[in-house]
From Swiss-Prot:
Alphabetized UniProt keyword annotations: Glycoprotein, Membrane, Signal, Transmembrane, Transmembrane helix
Composition skew (Pro residues), residue ranges: 162-171
Membrane topology: Single-pass type I membrane protein
One GO CC annotation: membrane
Positions of region (Disordered): 94-180
Record protein name field: Uncharacterized protein C11orf87
Source organism of this protein record: Homo sapiens
Intervals, Extracellular compartment: 24-61
Ranges facing Cytoplasmic side: 83-197
Residue stretches of biased makeup (Basic and acidic residues): 96-107, 125-136
InterPro entries: C11orf87 (IPR037670)
């Protein structure tokens, strides 16, 4: 039996237990009685040795467990802080973007309200250009009182400086004078054309 004992059991058990298990009970009589005293003392020391070995192994496993838990807690803490920081950064970015958008929108609305709209100025400008072009675009003299001239020679241009268009009917003498000057110039033009022909 002693030769068949596994080596692992020999390494695990303390030497006192190995000595007691593998010792042969050959002593008898007085020898046995004399050996009981030191056996009792040896059993006490053996218990203390076993307790020390168990405490050492338990303490080593406990230290390993504590180290593993600490490492795991550190990893979890670092991941949680990273996620929290990331969420805060996202919230700050969203707030900044919203503030910039609100500022741009407010500035655009204020600028658009203060400046006049270009669509409203276009009709007045067109009216002014039309009023300016009306006296310039009349190269033909068309007095209201020159009916004979229109029947005899329609569409003849005025040679020389032509008088401006007649004023309203309130100023009748000035209109008559303008019509007479236009008639004189038209008559001179007719005479020149007849002589040349």
């Amino acid at each position: 039996m002693s030769a068949r004992a596994p080596k692992e059991l020999r390494l695990a058990l303390p030497p006192c237990l190995l000595n007691r298990t593998f010792a042969s009970p050959n002593a008898s009589g007085s020898g046995n009685t004399g050996a009981r005293g030191p056996g009792a003392v040896g059993s006490g020391t053996c218990i203390t040795q076993v307790g020390q070995q168990l405490f050492q192994s338990f303490s080593s496993t406990l230290v390993l467990i504590v180290l593993v838990t600490l490492i795991f807690c550190l990893i979890v803490l670092s991941l949680s802080t990273f996620h929290i920081h990331k969420r805060r950064m996202k919230k700050r970015k969203m707030q900044r973007a919203q503030e910039e958008y609100e500022r741009d929108h407010c500035s655009g609305s204020r600028g658009g309200g203060g400046l006049p709209r270009p669509g409203r100025q276009a009709p007045t400008h067109a009216k002014e250009t039309r009023l300016e072009r009306q006296p310039r675009d009349s190269p033909f003299c068309a007095p209201s009182n020159a009916s004979s001239l229109s029947s005899s020679s329609p569409g003849l241009p005025c040679q020389g400086p032509c008088a401006p268009p007649p004023p309203p009917p309130a100023s009748s003498p000035q209109g008559a004078h303008a019509a007479s000057s236009c008639l004189d110039t038209a008559g001179e033009g007719l005479l020149q054309t007849v002589v040349l022909s």
